[in-house]
From Swiss-Prot:
UniProt KW keywords: Signal
Signal peptide region: 1-27
Species in which this protein is naturally found: Chlamydia pneumoniae (Chlamydophila pneumoniae)
Keyword Ribosomal protein: no
Protein name: Protein CPn_1058/CP_0792/CPj1058/CpB1100
Length: 363
């Protein structure tokens, strides 16, 4: 999967509000303690322009790798520029985007760090050439806007993309092998039978409602009986011939458009009338007196829903089941990594609810 597709997959937010400072420069090194959540609120640097800079430790993966607020900011920078390059000069747009996306991106960055650590243990790496190609595909060869507006160095950009690609690679390897074992031909056939059963419960009704009018109710009833007899005998709908018949008897024919509806779309009154018709032996049931004349329900077709043959549907079903299983396996893999490295979701929830706003606050 291309990285830019992953970036596009994150929900985009409309622009607005006040710009919150985003500075790419690293501060002096923050001492790492044994706890992944200590030093959570230490501020290391301040932008001369008056915007707060927060290179705080958010999570400690191991002795060599920690997730800082700056890692999240760098990811937000690239996501924003990839989605809205034309708004790179808009402080309000960046403010709205960063504030709204911070919770989502924080968790994704932590998961990426965990997967990169797992990839390292499994000796899985991404070719630097592939990383550079991805950067060029996403942003072109001119990266000066990223340097100028986000103060990100080439190495900063490389690290974000390398981490994302490596996480995608190890995730793909872990997920695909397990999912392929679960999406078996038997599972595909079972899902196809389920679709067949669902389709068979859908009945499609195609019908018209005819109204016969005349000077008297008695005459309208007689003409309606003749129209019903003609339709049930001919088994075809010929509006011109029926109109001529009604006019010759001193009446007027009004016909509705042709309806094509499923059971769930039918009104109760129409459903009751259509059920009384002995289709396909007859097209019309008995005429019903109405204030506007006599009504006839003419059933042109009644079919059960169906789906394409298995050999046509197999590929689509396989893709659908693969996606469902992949989502489940991916969650299980992430949960195992979080448990292994001591990820505490409650601490992250606290960070998001209580401490995230100061990370992007104005002085």
């Amino acid at each position: 999967m291309k990285l830019y597709q992953t970036l596009r997959g994150i929900v985009l937010v409309s622009t607005g509000c006040i710009f919150l400072g985003m500075h790419g420069g690293y501060a002096a090194e923050v001492p790492v303690t044994s706890s992944g959540y200590e030093n959570l609120l230490e501020s290391k640097e301040q932008d001369p322009s008056g915007l707060a800079i927060h290179d705080r430790i958010l999570f400690k993966v191991d002795e060599e790798n920690v997730v800082t607020a700056l890692d999240v900011i760098h990811k937000l920078n690239l996501l924003f520029y990839n989605s809205y390059p034309h708004l790179i000069d808009s402080f309000p747009a960046r403010s709205q985007y960063y504030t709204a996306m911070w919770p989502v991106v924080l968790e994704s960055v932590i998961d990426e760090f965990l997967m990169v650590a797992d990839a390292k243990a499994k000796r899985i790496a991404t070719d630097p050439t592939a990383v550079n190609q991805e950067i060029e595909e996403m942003f072109g060869r001119d990266l000066s806007p990223l340097y100028a507006h986000f103060e990100m160095s080439p190495n900063d950009i490389f690290n974000v993309i390398d981490r994302t690609l490596t996480a995608q690679r190890v995730m793909g390897m872990m997920v695909r092998s397990k999912v392929m074992l679960k999406v078996t031909p038997g599972k595909i056939r079972e899902y196809y039978r389920k679709l067949e059963e669902e389709a068979s419960r859908k009945v499609i009704w195609k019908y018209r409602v005819l109204t016969i009018k005349a000077n008297t109710e008695s005459l309208a009833s007689q003409i309606a009986d003749k129209v019903r007899a003609r339709l049930n005998e001919a088994k075809t709908w010929d509006k011109d011939r029926l109109t001529a018949l009604v006019i010759s008897q001193g009446g007027q024919l009004v016909c509705s458009e042709e309806f094509s509806r499923e059971n769930s779309e039918l009104s109760q009154s129409h459903k009751q009338e259509l059920d009384l018709i002995g289709y396909p032996k007859e097209l019309c049931g008995l005429p019903k007196a109405h204030k506007s004349g006599y009504k006839l329900y003419m059933l042109l077709d009644k079919t059960s829903g169906s789906i394409e043959p298995l050999d046509v549907m197999e590929s689509k079903i396989k893709q659908h089941l693969f996606a469902l299983e992949a989502e489940s396996v991916e969650k299980q893999y992430k949960d195992r990594l979080r448990k292994r490295y001591g990820y505490d979701a409650s601490m992250i929830a606290k960070l998001l609810s209580e401490e995230a706003p100061p990370l992007f606050s104005l002085l």
